[in-house]
Amino acid sequence: MKDRNDELKDIVKEKYSEIANQSKQQNEISCCGSTGCCGDVDYTIFSEKYDTLKGYNPDADLGLGCGLPTEFAQIKAGDTVIDLGSGAGNDCFVARALVGDAGKVIGIDFTEAMINKARENAKKMN
């Protein structure tokens, strides 16, 4: 019998796998995205524009993040960056542009579907 923690992990994996497998048009936006899920509260302040950043890949932008973590991380050329919960790779691709050839970016995600999506997106960028 599964305990509550395992049940919750399964729910999270299932939901994010569904999102990874949806088309961009079908994708439901998270609370931090442009439409929000949490009533009348406007969360669009978190929905910063990635599309002006070097390394941005629109196919990797599933609207699941909050803000632009790469702007606050003080990433420099040659750094090693680890992105936990990397999803389809959006922040990883932006970070890769910042660290350059001398750096390294590692994306880690909980779901195999998101990892596969990130790999597909990475192939499009090479």
Model-identified regions with their sequence ranges:
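Class I SAM-dependent methyltransferase SAM/SAH-binding core
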Residues: 59, 77-126
